[in-house]
A protein has these predicted regions:
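Residue-identity detector for glycine
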Residues: 9-10, 14, 29-32
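Metal-dependent phosphodiesterase/nuclease catalytic metal-binding core
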Residues: 27-29, 153-296, 305-316, 332-337
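Conserved beta-strand hairpin/beta-sheet module of binuclear metal-dependent hydrolase folds
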Residues: 27-80, 118, 178-180, 226-237, ...
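Active-site neighborhood of phospho(di)ester-bond hydrolases with catalytic His/Asp-centered motifs
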Residues: 67-70, 87-95, 123-124, 235-240, ...
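Active-site metal-binding motif and surrounding structural segment of the metallo-beta-lactamase
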Residues: 71-122, 144-154
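Metal-dependent catalytic neighborhoods of phosphoester/phosphodiester hydrolases
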Residues: 102-110, 131-134, 304-312
Length: 337
């Protein structure tokens, strides 16, 4: 189930790397919660008076994650009435300025708000060095900034029930796409619990993901849970040529967000040269991945009206939308399952 709010105006293929430290207890407790998704900006290369640079904000269970932070990202957040201070993680797809140059200002704003909680940054190899360079103008902060560089041997990582999957894409610098996945445990099966002689007094606690012990016997959540149900998934990838990694990681997504740098068919040669995607190529990926909805983003500054290409693009994938700054969606678990 989802609810979409769309303001009319405003603002090398590689190995899959899975970042996952979600505990079974967290998975067992994820019920009835909402994932807020907001595409803060939709521009590529440079901010424009009517279009901020591409950035994605997601909020779930009281936590916030931001993907990319170009120039003006915190202004786009303010326009939505959101504060940068609650951000817990910032992920970077790559280190071109339109995706990371807004970080120093964001850090200073957080510091001025007297933030004390650590901030986690995730990005390609070299992140620590890049952040150190940017922090020359933000050296004194009242909170710790931690960096995790994605490598082929990345260690599992968890964040309040999110599972993050980073996958290599094909740009002219090292670049990754991201999927955010929220797993959902199965329903509590009373008959199964009774068959295994689980005391009824433990049922509610097992549903919350607790592991319990009584008289030397251990009771775990999976002993009373049915098959895992469909959770939620959002996939985001920009600044890349079409790759098999994007297709594979997009499967099962409730919302797919891909770059549509160019809408004109004759810009395909330019897209290939600069390692970007056309709207038509993005639509083809969405079709092959069988997702329910595609939002296009990261438009060329020369493209003032991306929506004018939708009639032709939808011939490939009907559920394609030329996203605008500030588009939001609320994703919920299907309570019918």
């Amino acid at each position: 189930m989802d609810r979409q709010i769309c303001p009319s105006g405003g603002r090398s293929t590689g190995d899959r790397i899975i970042i996952d430290r979600t505990t079974d207890a967290v998975k067992a407790g994820l019920r009835g919660r909402m994932l807020d998704v907001c595409l803060l900006g939709t521009g590529g290369m440079m901010p424009l008076p009517y279009r901020w640079l591409t950035s994605l904000m997601m909020r779930y269970n009281g936590k916030s994650i931001l993907i990319d932070c170009g120039e003006g990202t915190q202004i786009a957040m303010r326009e939505k009435g959101w504060s940068p201070n609650p951000i817990d993680i910032i992920c970077f797809t790559h280190f071109h300025a339109d995706h990371i140059s807004g970080l120093p200002g964001m850090l200073l704003t957080m510091g001025n708000a007297e933030r004390t909680e650590p901030l986690l940054l995730i990005g390609p190899r070299g992140l620590t060095k890049v952040v150190a360079s940017l922090r020359v103008i933000a050296p004194e902060l009242p909170f710790e900034v931690k960096c995790i560089e994605i490598t082929e041997n990345a260690q599992p990582f968890s964040f309040e029930g999110f599972r993050l999957e980073a996958f290599r894409v094909n740009h002219n610098v090292l670049c990754y796409g991201y999927s955010m996945v929220i797993d959902r445990a199965g329903r509590f099966d009373k008959d199964r619990a009774m068959e295994q002689e689980i005391p009824m007094k433990f049922w509610s606690r097992l549903q919350k993901g607790e592991t319990l012990e009584e008289n030397g016997r251990v009771f775990t959540p999976d002993m009373g849970l049915g098959a895992e149900r469909k959770g939620l998934k959002v996939t985001y990838s920009t600044d890349t040529r079409p790759t098999e990694s994007i297709r594979q990681n997009s499967k099962g997504s409730d919302l797919l967000i891909l770059e549509g740098m160019y809408g004109e068919p004759d810009k395909l040669v330019k897209a290939r040269e600069h390692k970007h995607m056309t709207m038509y190529e993005a639509a083809k990926i969405a079709k092959e991945a069988e997702v329910p909805k595609l939002w296009l983003t990261h438009y060329s500054p020369s493209m003032t009206r991306p929506e004018e290409f939708m009639e032709d693009v939808r011939k490939i994938f009907p559920a394609t939308y030329a996203a605008k700054d500030g588009w939001t969606m609320e994703l919920k678990f299907d309570e019918g399952e």
